[in-house]
Regions:
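Acidic beta-strand-to-loop metal/phosphate-binding motif
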Residues: 112, 150-162, 180
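Short, acidic/turn-prone active-site loops that include or flank metal/cofactor-
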Residues: 133-139, 158-161, 181-184
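Short, aromatic/basic amphipathic alpha-helical patches
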Residues: 165-174
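Phosphate-handling DNA/RNA-contact segment within nucleic-acid enzymes
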Residues: 49-152, 166-167
C-alpha cells in the first residue's frame, strides 16, 4: 500500500510541475478548440523538464487520469504531428478509463468516446458528461459494469472502421445510442469545424430543450 501511495504522490507532483508549463502548448490546444482555461480544468501540462522516469516524454502534452483518490496515471501526447507514436503511456501501466469522475456527475445518460482530447472536448468544452478510452481496442469488461446503471449511453464513433466496430461492440453490452462522426472525423475535429451545436444535434439533445 505504501508503494502505491508513494507512486500516487509522484504522479501528483509530476502533474503539478507539468501544469506550470501548459502555456507552451497554447497554440496546439487552440488548434484543437481547447482553451488554456479548459486545459487547466483537465490539469493538462507539458513535459518541459522531465521527472525521473519520464525522460522519454520530453516535450509532450501530459494528460493525467484523475479519480476521487487523485492522479492514478499519466499519458503523453506528441505536440508535433510528425512525431510518432502519437500517444505514449507510463512503462508497465495498464490502460484505464479516462475522466471517471463524470460517472458520478452524470444524470440518466453519459457519453463514451475514444481518446482523451475527444473526452475533454465533450466534457469540458460542450458540457456533455463523458468518459473515454485510449483507443477502440482498450475496452474492458468492468467498464461495462461501471456504466450499467445509465438509461442511455451515447457512443461517439470515429469516422473510420475501428470506430464503427467499437460502437457496435458496445451496443451488444449497453443501452447504446451511436453518434457517428463523418468519414475521417472524430469528436474534436467535428467540434473545431462545426461547433458544439453540431454535436448536440447529432445526439438529438437540441430537440429536447
Amino acid at each position: 500500500v505504501k508503494q502505491r501511495e508513494s507512486q500516487k504522490d509522484l504522479l501528483e507532483l509530476a502533474t503539478k510541475r507539468y501544469q506550470e508549463n501548459i502555456y507552451l502548448a497554447e497554440d496546439y490546444l487552440r488548434s484543437r478548440g481547447i482553451t488554456i482555461e479548459v486545459a487547466r480544468l483537465a490539469r493538462l501540462g507539458v513535459v518541459a523538464k522531465a521527472e525521473v522516469g519520464h525522460e522519454g516524454f520530453l516535450g509532450r502534452l501530459s494528460i493525467p487520469y484523475i479519480t476521487k483518490s487523485g492522479v492514478v496515471d499519466l499519458r503523453f501526447r506528441s505536440l508535433n504531428p510528425a512525431v510518432e507514436p502519437k500517444y505514449m503511456g507510463m512503462t508497465g501501466a495498464d490502460t484505464k478509463m479516462y475522466n471517471v469522475l463524470d460517472i458520478e456527475r452524470a444524470g440518466d445518460w453519459i457519453g463514451v468516446c475514444e481518446g482523451e482530447l475527444d473526452t475533454i472536448t465533450l466534457g469540458k468544452c460542450i458540457g456533455i458528461p463523458c468518459v473515454g478510452v485510449p483507443g477502440a481496442n482498450s475496452w474492458k469488461k468492468h467498464y461495462t459494469r461501471l456504466l450499467a446503471d445509465f438509461e442511455r449511453v451515447f457512443v461517439f464513433a470515429d469516422g473510420d472502421q475501428p470506430g464503427k466496430e467499437f460502437a457496435t461492440s458496445l451496443a451488444r453490452e449497453l443501452p447504446v445510442t451511436i453518434v457517428s462522426m463523418g468519414d475521417g472525423e472524430d469528436v474534436n475535429s467535428s467540434y473545431v469545424k462545426y461547433g458544439a451545436d453540431y454535436i448536440r444535434d447529432k445526439m438529438g439533445l437540441n430537440d429536447e430543450r
